[in-house]
Amino acid sequence: DAAAVAQVVELLLDNATRYASEDSVIELSLRAVSRGAGKGSAELVVSNAVDELPEGDLDRLFDRFYRADVSRSSKTGGSGVGLSVVRAIAEAHGGSATVSGHDHQIAFTVCF
């Protein structure tokens, strides 16, 4: 579903532009991944530098209305819904959405 994939890309890029550290490079990559038996899927990754990673469980970033402490300023706005929509779309299409972070770098990975 092209519209759903476009919405995922838009939401992830919106999230990255809101919360990336100043002068951060936002990277988007898309690659084909073999799932065996002639089946394939796509892996979309959006990553960027952040001033600080949210403390605790990064996976909570996908919870509806959850906002990490570092993102509560009025400068960034947002309602805490976008990433939960990303995960819902991915799962509705038989995929997944995950997040990883290390050394002021955060990456969101969506597999379809």
Model regions and ranges:
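Short beta-strand/loop element within the Bergerat-fold HATPase_c
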Residues: D23-G40
